Amino acid sequence: MTHYLLVDGYNVIHANASLAKVAADSLDAARKKLCDALCEFRALSRYRIIVVFDAHLVAGGIGSVENHRGIKVIFTKEAETADHYIEAATYKLARKKQDKITVATSDTLEQLIILAAGASRISAADLWTEIETTRKTALATHKNSRPIKKNPIESLIDPETAQILENMRYAK
């Protein structure tokens, strides 16, 4: 079973105070930071992540699909909102009964629509909480699973050689 996470990009950016501040200066930088956070989350959670950004106000925009370190990044075409794209993708993925779909958005209407399609939802704020919790858990697990072992040279050489080296160390 594949577990998809569809992310309403700008909605999730603006749910994070530090990213919203970055977005005020540079949407490109905010999008990159979001995608980087989602890439790390994908590696730890095993979701297949699709993040969707509105480009519906871009005159003549044809839309695009990019791969950013293992996540699919969608820029919608002119006159297509991220919400519309996410709804259509949710319905398409929901036809495969074996797949699980979660949509990250804080848009109430969007949540109702995707719930009706058979997907689950997570608010943008809750997604940030899950990302941070997953990261902290992985760090703690990694730290605890690899005890630091000292491997002093004394354990690798015979006592006679150790004594010779010790004498050399203190010789003047």
Short names for language-model regions:
Residues H3-L5, N11-K172:
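Nuclease catalytic cores that cleave nucleic-acid phosphodiester bonds
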